[in-house]
Structure formats: structure tokens, C-alpha cells
């Protein structure tokens, strides 16, 4: 060991001496004595490695307390951090899908802070049923006889099949054997539920007679799966629920539908593409309809099943129901969200999902033009900052081929180097509230459809 190396090692402080420093008192109060000591030991090991490898001290050795504070502050950040979603995908699965309405946030907060009547009947002081209040709301909105709530729509499909068709066959069109994110496939779910898949028709064309010929003494259900995350176009044929229900009645076989996204309002009245609604399928005579709570409905993650009373009763009594049931926070948020649907005239103002989906391209364009000047002044030395038209998508497998006209701020490096775009995107991901855009066609795009807090956005990007 050289004299210089020995001298550098001698400059490393003892942990006890560091802890006696007044600057460490608040750190110990905030993060705990044990964690501070653990980190100091780790940092001393790091410093020794740097000395050994490069014959220098790390820069942070000049202020140990500051470095400890920086590291522990970063460590203490929640893994679920708020971000500004400027990806152009409104219901972004990786960013948590639907934003909750203020009424839902308030309801969840109350449910978290206090005991609630989750399974308690105030009328007779007996045990109640956790789905009761929501079932009443859902029946009022959809016209169903009863309803059941589980923790997501994949769970809803699993429960629906396991409780009504285990050990038997379920007839489904080949063109509806969907796969959604996370390799969730209808054939796999059927297998897990103990059902036998009987696929009929072809990928692009399925006729009523295909279902009829598939039915046998072991058939439990005729099933429709709404292909919400893809579209088959061209030379196609599919029968709708009303026609399938008529066939089911003739053959005395129930019809069930996995609707996927599930919208409780006619989106076309807001200028959006129409999606099938649960109430339409219930009116057509479908026995069970499942759909998601956190997609087009705009609520928390939940799986909702509405339908005939005797069918729902089979789901409620199945052992899987307890394993898949929703907790009090989910139920509180979902109830508050559903109550908004009782006043549809105010829905686009109070439901964030609908509010964002219905923002006009003109309004977003004006917003982009308002923000372009200060951002161009700040970033103009490296990037050309422009306002450009773009197309937003709904996301989460909803209306996959439909796009919403929008406007974006784009950042194009003057030198054309893609590494500069990656670097800029990385810098924005390190902001106190990360800004998430997308890199495409040699530009970094910030689709402003979901930007509502302009002031906070500007303050962070102009630092």
C-alpha cells in the first residue's frame, strides 16, 4: 500500500464521530438510527473501493450528511409515484388506468380511516353481504336482476366459468379467443376453471348454425367474448347476443358474455366511438355479463358481473368468490363512481376518464400553443420545440382501432441524434413528478390530452 493510499484511508471518518455531528440528528430522527448506521457502513465500503481502484476519495466525502440525506430521501420514495401522463394513451395500463373521481377518492379515504358497514346490517345487527349496496346500484343502472363484484375482470371471467360450467363444455367462436395483457387467454382461463373449450366457426366468420351443431348433452354455456383489444375487418360474420340468446332459449342453454372494457353510457353521445353496454346485453337476455371497473367505466380495478338472480347466486356461493372478492376500499370507490352515473348530465365533468376522452383537439391545440413559447425559450438551444397534431388512443384494450385527434409538443434535437432524445426523456423521468412522453419518428412527443395541471408542468420543465 502506498503512502498516498494510506493517507486517503486515514481521511475516512469513524461512524461514531459522524453520528455525533449535529447534522445527523435529524437524519436519525427521520430514518432511524439503525438505517443510518447501515448506510454509513455501506458508504465507507464504497469509499474504500474507490480509493483502492482510483487512488481518490469520492466527491461526496466532503459532506457525508448531505449524501446520506440524498440517498435516504430517494430510498424513501414510494414505488407508486405520481406521474404526468403525456404518452397519448388515456387509460394507460402501466400508469394505473383510470383516474378516480373526487367522490371516489373521498369515499376511499373515509373507508380507510374508519370501520364501515362492509358486511354488517344496521337494520337487524346481523351479518350483511358486501356486494349488496353495489348490486342495487348496478341493477338500477343496467336493468339486471343481481350483481357480483370481484377484484378484476379476469377474476370475473374465471368465477363465471367455474361456477356455471366446471366439468362441462363452453361453446365460443374461434374469432373471440382473445388474449389480453399478461398472457391472459380465454382458453387458459377455461382450463383453469375446469371447463372444456368447444370452439366453433373460423377466425373471421362464425354462423348461428356453428353454435347449434356444437351443442351436445355436455354443453353448459354459449359464450360471447367482446374483442375489445383488436378488430377483425373485411370478409367477416358474427352473430350478436340477441341472436345467440334466441338460440340459447331454443336449446335451453344460458348465454354469457365477457364484455371486457364495459361502458355504462353510450359514448357516441360524446362524439366517441360506441362500445357495447352491459344494459344492452341484459335487455337482449344474456344471463351473465362481466366487465371491468377501471377502464371505460372510470372507477377502481374491479370485475363486475351482472345478470340473472339464480346465476349470480351460484357465483356468490362458489368457493372462488371469497378468494376473489373486492376489499372495502375498492367497493367504496366503485360505489361512489357508480353513483355518478345516476346523474349522466354531469358525468363528463365529474368523471376524469370521460373528461379526458372528450377534450376537443381545438382546446388541446390552444393549450399546446400557450406552452410552446416558454418551453422553446428554455430548450431551444438543443431542440426545436413545435406544436404538432397527433392521435391519442383510449388504451387498456378499449376501442383498439379508434384514435382521438389531439395536439402535442414535440422536441427534435438540432443535431438529429437520438441519444439526445433518450437523455431528455430520462431527465424528465427524474423530475419530482416524472413527465412521461414517447419517442417516435425522431422526436420526443408530449401529447397534452391528459395535461390538466399546466402550472406544475411548466415549473418542473423550466427548472
UniProtKB/Swiss-Prot annotation:
Catalytic activity reads: L-seryl-tRNA(Sec) + selenophosphate + H(+) = L-selenocysteinyl-tRNA(Sec) + phosphate
Q: Point out residues bearing the modification N6-(pyridoxal phosphate)lysine.
A: 295
Question: Which proteins does it associate with, and in what oligomeric form?
Answer: Homodecamer; pentamer of dimers. Binds only one seryl-tRNA(Sec) per dimer.
Q: What's the family?
A: Belongs to the SelA family.
Q: Report the protein's function.
A: Converts seryl-tRNA(Sec) to selenocysteinyl-tRNA(Sec) required for selenoprotein biosynthesis.
What's the protein here called? L-seryl-tRNA(Sec) selenium transferase
User: Can you say where in the cell this protein is located?
Assistant: Cytoplasm
UniProt main location, coarse: cytoplasm
Amino acid at each position: 500500500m502506498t503512502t498516498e493510499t494510506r493517507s486517503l484511508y486515514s481521511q475516512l471518518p469513524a461512524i461514531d464521530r459522524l453520528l455525533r455531528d449535529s447534522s445527523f440528528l435529524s437524519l436519525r430522527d427521520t430514518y432511524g438510527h439503525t438505517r443510518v448506521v447501515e448506510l454509513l457502513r455501506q458508504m465507507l465500503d464504497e469509499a474504500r473501493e474507490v480509493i483502492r481502484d482510483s487512488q481518490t476519495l469520492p466527491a461526496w466525502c466532503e459532506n457525508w450528511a448531505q449524501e446520506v440525506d440524498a440517498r435516504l430521501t430517494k430510498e424513501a420514495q414510494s414505488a407508486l409515484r405520481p406521474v404526468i401522463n403525456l404518452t397519448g394513451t388515456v387509460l394507460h395500463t402501466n400508469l394505473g388506468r383510470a383516474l378516480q373521481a373526487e367522490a371516489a377518492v373521498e369515499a376511499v379515504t373515509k373507508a380507510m380511516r374508519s370501520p364501515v358497514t362492509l358486511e354488517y346490517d344496521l337494520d337487524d345487527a346481523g351479518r350483511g353481504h358486501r356486494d349488496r349496496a353495489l348490486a342495487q346500484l348496478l341493477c338500477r343502472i343496467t336493468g339486471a336482476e343481481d350483481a357480483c363484484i370481484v377484484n378484476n375482470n379476469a377474476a370475473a371471467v374465471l368465477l363465471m366459468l367455474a361456477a356455471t360450467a366446471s366439468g362441462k363444455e363452453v361453446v365460443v367462436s374461434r374469432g373471440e379467443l382473445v388474449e389480453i395483457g399478461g398472457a391472459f387467454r380465454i382458453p387458459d382461463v377455461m382450463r383453469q376453471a375446469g371447463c372444456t373449450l368447444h370452439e366453433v366457426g373460423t377466425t373471421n366468420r362464425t354462423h348461428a348454425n356453428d353454435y347449434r351443431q356444437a351443442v351436445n348433452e355436455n354443453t353448459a354455456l354459449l359464450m360471447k367474448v367482446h374483442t375489445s383489444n383488436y378488430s377483425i375487418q373485411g370478409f367477416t360474420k358474427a352473430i350478436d347476443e340477441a341472436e345467440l340468446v334466441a338460440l340459447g332459449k331454443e336449446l335451453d342453454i344460458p348465454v354469457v358474455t365477457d364484455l371486457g372494457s364495459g361502458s355504462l353510457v353510450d359514448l357516441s353521445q360524446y362524439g366517441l366511438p360506441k362500445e357495447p353496454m352491459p344494459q344492452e346485453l341484459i335487455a337482449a337476455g344474456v344471463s351473465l355479463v362481466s366487465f371491468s371497473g377501471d377502464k371505460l367505466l372510470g372507477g377502481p380495478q374491479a370485475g363486475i358481473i351482472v345478470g340473472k338472480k339464480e346465476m349470480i347466486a351460484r357465483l356468490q356461493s362458489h368457493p372462488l368468490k371469497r378468494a376473489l372478492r373486492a376489499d372495502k376500499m375498492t367497493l367504496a370507490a366503485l360505489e361512489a363512481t357508480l353513483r355518478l352515473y345516476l346523474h349522466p348530465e354531469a358525468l363528463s365533468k365529474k368523471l376524469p376518464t370521460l373528461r379526458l376522452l372528450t377534450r376537443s383537439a381545438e382546446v388541446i391545440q390552444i393549450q399546446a400553443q400557450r406552452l410552446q413559447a416558454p418551453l422553446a425559450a428554455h430548450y431551444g438551444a438543443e431542440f426545436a420545440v413545435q406544436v404538432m397534431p397527433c392521435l391519442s388512443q383510449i388504451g387498456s384494450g378499449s376501442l383498439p382501432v379508434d384514435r382521438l385527434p389531439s395536439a402535442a409538443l414535440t422536441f427534435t434535437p438540432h443535431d438529429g441524434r437520438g441519444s439526445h432524445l433518450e437523455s431528455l426523456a430520462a431527465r424528465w423521468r427524474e423530475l419530482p413528478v416524472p413527465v412521461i412522453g414517447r419517442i417516435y419518428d425522431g422526436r420526443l412527443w408530449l401529447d397534452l390530452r391528459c395535461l390538466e395541471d399546466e402550472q406544475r408542468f411548466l415549473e418542473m420543465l423550466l427548472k
